[in-house]
Amino acid sequence: MPGRRKTLFTLVVLFASGCHGWGGGPGTDTVEILSEKPSPNGRFIATSFYCEGGGAAGYCYWNASLRRAGDEVDQRDGLLGKHKTWKGFSDIKLRWIDGSNLEIACRQAKSEAYRDHVSEKVESRHGIRIHYILTN
């Protein structure tokens, strides 16, 4: 019996360590930059992007970000939606109104399943006010 326990323990440890990376995560995401628009003063960059990842469970989504020039895009710091790895927005277009106002036009999911998710949008970041236009 002790030999079986040792074998079972060894198998559990090997399985658990082998599955560690299967869940994906931000480091395994594939991010495609669709559009980048620098602010009029060049201090900020608005970006629309597509992201996929998540390992076996998988996800893909479109979103937008606003970052300081020189910073990398953080796909988990999107401006659109409550859950940062959910779909819910598409056809994202960016336009600077002026140096302190950014306009984001996009299509928004209408399904009841997305109601809570699409209800949240970041209103400002880095002192930039963000205006949303829904195109559907």
PLM region spans:
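C-terminal motif of bacterial Sec signal peptides marking the signal peptidase cleavage site
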Residues: S17-G18
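Acidic, small-residue rich beta-repeat scaffolds with periodic aromatic anchors
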Residues: G21, G81-N136
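Surface-exposed loop/turn elements that mediate protein-protein interactions on large endomembrane-trafficking
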Residues: G24-G25, L66-R76, K121-R129
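N-terminal secretory signal peptides that target proteins for export/translocation
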Residues: M1-P2
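N-terminal export leaders
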Residues: T7-L8
